[in-house]
């Protein structure tokens, strides 16, 4: 019986040793797994924080860029408004020329157009006093003296604020103040911008 007791005791001791070994191994495995998971969680945390910081920087840069673009666009719009106002004031000044200066503008412009003498000068109703019958007769006489037909006529139905349109057989040459300023605007806008904003 003592052999049986010894055998039982040996089995129990071996089982106890195996249990301790298994528990120690399980504890080591547990610690390894926990350490690995903790390290992974720490790495994930760092990665998430890094990504969040990068996204925050990108978002911040985008917001700043959009704000700068918006300010730039507002400034450009304001500059364009000022430049448009300058050109509109130029049109107003032309509309307020004295009768003598206005006639000089019309005569010098007509001289540069090489008239045939059969054209129609389209003006607005407001300018009919400047383009009187005497003015028209003098213009036609001058054309006749140059060997051209002297039969220019007036049409007072223009829907513009100043200047004139010359109609030559259905082809219209626009010499209104608006057309004059608009044709020069492309050339002058850069210079006006320099004068106003530099």
Curated annotation (Swiss-Prot):
Biological process (GO), any one: proton motive force-driven plasma membrane ATP synthesis
SUPFAM superfamilies attached to this UniProt entry: V-type ATPase subunit E-like (SSF160527)
Keyword Transport on entry: yes
Annotated keywords: ATP synthesis, Hydrogen ion transport, Ion transport, Transport
Taxonomy, superkingdom: Bacteria
GO MF, one example: proton-transporting ATP synthase activity, rotational mechanism
Cross-referenced Pfam families: vATP-synt_E
InterPro entries tied to this protein: ATPase_E_C, ATPase_V1_Esu
GO cellular component entries: proton-transporting two-sector ATPase complex, catalytic domain
HAMAP family: ATP_synth_E_arch
Function summary: Produces ATP from ADP in the presence of a proton gradient across the membrane.
Record-stated family: Belongs to the V-ATPase E subunit family.
Protein name according to UniProt: V-type ATP synthase subunit E
The organism of origin for this protein: Clostridium perfringens (strain 13 / Type A)
